[in-house]
Curated annotation (Swiss-Prot):
Pfam families: UPF0122. NCBIfam families: PRK00118.2-1, YlxM. It comes from Thermoanaerobacter sp. (strain X514). Might take part in the signal recognition particle (SRP) pathway. This is inferred from the conservation of its genetic proximity to ftsY/ffh. May be a regulatory protein. This is UPF0122 protein Teth514_1714. It comes from the Bacteria. Belongs to the UPF0122 family.
Length: 117
């Protein structure tokens, strides 16, 4: 799978509910169920060009929502920061011997795991 494909499905996870029913249906068939444009065309009894146009409108809408709202970018930033914090906690766990500090570190680690989105 290429990065564009994965990014588009991530956008769909965040903003898919904002698409029209027809856009959602075609997007899911194409991206999530791996149907070709021709297969979707046959199943929905619309032209291949109609499927293509609807899919492109859905993709453009998802990109527009991300441009305006930035939820995916923010989510990725949060996940990257959580990963850095987890790595820091592991380093502290390996080096720290004070039981009280280790207890605090374990509590912080549990809180971070609960945040894992």
């Amino acid at each position: 799978m290429d990065d564009d494909f994965l990014f588009m499905t991530l956008l769909y996870d965040f903003y898919g509910a904002l698409l029209t029913d027809k856009q959602r249906e075609i997007f899911e068939m194409y991206y999530l169920n791996d149907y070709s444009l021709g297969e979707i065309s046959e199943l929905l009894d619309i032209s291949r060009q109609g499927v293509y146009d609807t899919l492109k409108r859905a993709e453009s809408s998802l990109e527009f929502f991300e441009e305006k709202l930035g939820l995916v970018k923010r989510h990725q930033e949060i996940m990257n920061k959580l990963d850095k914090i987890k790595k820091g906690i592991e380093i502290i766990r390996e080096r720290e011997r004070d039981p009280e500090i280790l207890k605090i570190i374990e509590e912080i680690a549990r809180e971070i795991e609960e945040l894992n989105l």
